[in-house]
C-alpha cells in the first residue's frame, strides 16, 4: 500500500501545514483532494460526491474544544474516506457450516490461484481444516501451481491433471473433502466477455452449491473493477470480493471504491507475494495506514504474538540479555514479516519517508545477523565474553560473512544490552501482559 500512501501523503502534509482554515484554503484543499482521489483512480462521480461532502463538513463543522482546526480537517478526511470504502464495520470470515464451500472466480491474471492458497493459509492459522480443489482445465500450470502452494502451507490438495471436465472435478473434490471444515475451489481465469467460460463457472456453482462465492480482482485495474464485478454478477451471486496486489499500485483505492459502489463487500486484500501477506479488509485501519496515521493496534498485536511465543519479554526482564535472547529477538522481528509492511503500521507516514533501499538494507542486516548467531554454539550464545578472534573467524565462515560483519553485529548487541532497561520499559508500555 506504499504507492497509495504516497499519493495521500502530500495531501496530509498540506493539511498539517495549514495554520488557518478560510475559504481560500478550503478551495485549495478541495483541488488537492480531487487530485489525490483521481491519482488513486477513484471513479469521477465518486470523486465529485466525496469532495463536496468533505469540504461541506470542513466548512460547517466546528472542531471540539482543544482540537486544532487542521487536525479536525484531517479527521473529516479520514472519516469520509472510511465511508467511501464501506464504513466502520470490518469484514469477517466465519464458516457457519461443515464443510463450508468457497468458490473463487476472477479474470485471468488476477492472482486467483495464489489467493486460494493465501485464504487457505489464513484459515489454517485460525484452526480450520482446509482442502484446496483446482478445477482449471484451461491453464496447464494452474494444477502444479496450486499443488505446490498447498504442499508449502501443509494443506491437502485435489485436482485431476488429465481431466477436461471442470464441473466433475469440482464435484469430486468436494466429495473428497467432505470431512473438512472449509473447501476452497479454484476456477479457470475468465474474461468478462467469454460467454462459454462464464457459463462453465455457473455450472460449477449449480453443481456444488457453494456457501460463498468470492470474486478476485487485481488492484491495478483501478476503477474498471466495477465492470468486472458487474459482469460476473450477471451470471451468479457474488457474496464478497478479494482485491489482490494492493502493495504494488496507487490504483488500489479506486478498485476498492469501484467495487463497493456495486454493492459487493470487500472481504480481504492481498498486500504482498508471500502467503501470509493477506488481511481481512478493515476500512478504518486501511484508511489510517494510507493517511500515514499507522495501525498501532495491528503492530502491537503482531509484536505481542511473536514475543509471547518466544517468551523474550520474561528473559529481558530477568536481565538475561545474552546472545541467545538476542537471537530470539531477531527471529521474532523476522516473523513479523517484511519490514516494509511493519513500517506501514507506524504513524507519521514512516513507510513513505524511508527509502526502499534503506528498508531492504535493514532487512538484509537482520537476516545476516540471524545467520551469524545460528553459526554459534550454545556456549557462545550464553557466554559472549568467550568470543575471541579464532571463534569469530569460525563463526564468519559458517555464516558466509566476514569477521568484520560478526564484530559489527556484536557492537549492535552491546549497545542493545546497555539500552535494555529502556527497552524493558517500552515493551511493558506497548505490550501489556
Curated annotation (Swiss-Prot):
Its EC number is 3.6.5.4. SUPFAM superfamilies: Domain of the SRP/SRP receptor G-proteins, P-loop containing nucleoside triphosphate hydrolases, Signal peptide-binding domain. It is found in: Cytoplasm. It catalyses: GTP + H2O = GDP + phosphate + H(+). Gene3D superfamilies: P-loop containing nucleotide triphosphate hydrolases, Signal recognition particle SRP54, nucleotide-binding domain, Signal recognition particle, SRP54 subunit, M-domain. One of its GO terms (cellular component) is signal recognition particle. GO terms for biological process: SRP-dependent cotranslational protein targeting to membrane. It is an enzyme of class 3 (hydrolase). Part of the signal recognition particle protein translocation system, which is composed of SRP and FtsY. Archaeal SRP consists of a 7S RNA molecule of 300 nucleotides and two protein subunits: SRP54 and SRP19. This is Signal recognition particle 54 kDa protein. It comes from Pyrobaculum islandicum (strain DSM 4184 / JCM 9189 / GEO3). The gene is srp54.
